[in-house]
């Protein structure tokens, strides 16, 4: 065994271990706190099967998938050439039925709930990656302009959990097509702010997906969601009553096995009938024919019969995911292809998810003025590139941006500005809970100076700001594996120079 192989193996093992130990533990508690959880034991007679494992090991382009409101079918892309399930999975029998409810006091808490339950990174808790799922369960009333609140009644019969072994994920042969397409990617992106520069990377994500299913939980489940716009100002109890009535109808609303539903009064039911909310019933797992029959208002016998199917006929009710770039980085550390896996990760997180498309305008001389761009960080290393999203310097860019105003002051931009290249920043609060610094040509009155200076009774852009501001940094995605890769590449170069 060569010294290089020994060193690389040891460093890779150490890096993966350190990542697991040092990566931040995601806070899975959100404001959609589960209340009054009731648990009962069931006997599981079913054995692990292709049906119970579902899409385990398959790749999906998560931002196109509805992870909440329908049965998630095993129609993903092949990622591994050979992945023997009996050898590569750890299956744990669960055997519990849980009844609880989750209150979502904001759109952010709904996003957090989806990210937590699917193990999708908190940094991807936003509209690009999870927007399709949130829109599906709220009937599109959740948007960048509209905040929502809501509640779900959750009936979950857990049969078993099947999770891929880390050793198999890191060592089993990848699909020959995936390997061929990945290794054909460009290592160096010459103009990272242009989407066309990332065409092959985008095609790879579309073909193989951004994430693979790392864990499948099977059983049978029923979720009754109710949502309304936050400005309607319904309280927690109003959502609870509406969910109970929506699930079982007015006559059986108090008989569905939830503590919050048990005390529903006739007066509350009548009041709820006049409250307009979005209702969504989601049935997952169990038998296909049983799922198809569970529509509209359900009686307690229907509910219990379906939940018990978890004992004998479980199918997937929940999936947990892992990014495809994590698998590729682990596979290609210490090789010339590692940079491509880093590129893929930062392109997805920074360019696509954060939303760092190239924005520009023209000044009074028709010269191009850049507003936002995805570019290399100053400290970027070709072996493991680092990118940033940055916005143009705030203030004037051209003399025509500056306008003399009475009382001897200069306005930058404004409603009558024709140049429209006086750039201004604003911080937008996203409904996913995060914030984003944005840059735009200022058309509002009162934006004084900002590079404009008085020259007699005229104003000129005599002191323009030259400093771009970073709004997203790929340095946040750097980890121990990147450091190990750079050590290995440096050693390889030294060995080749001997």
Swiss-Prot record:
Alphabetized, the UniProt keywords read: Coiled coil, Cytolysis, Disulfide bond, EGF-like domain, Hemolysis, Nematocyst, Secreted, Signal, Toxin
Propeptide positions in this record? Answer: 23-35
Query: What cystine linkages occur within this chain?
Result: 389-402, 396-410, 412-422
Q: Which InterPro entries match?
A: MACPF
Family matches, as Pfam families = MACPF
Q: GO BP, one example?
A: killing of cells of another organism
* Signal sequence region: 1-22
In this chain the MACPF domain maps to 23-359
- UniProt feature coiled coil, ranges: 135-159
GO MF terms listed in the record are:
toxin activity
Q: Where in the cell is it found?
A: Secreted; Nematocyst
Describe its function.
Is lethal to mice, and may cause hemolytic activity.
PANTHER family documented for this protein: COMPLEMENT COMPONENT C6 (PTHR45742), FLOCCULATION PROTEIN FLO11 (PTHR45742:SF8)
Q: What is the name attached to this protein's record?
A: DELTA-thalatoxin-Avl2a
Q: Which organism encodes this protein? A: Actineria villosa
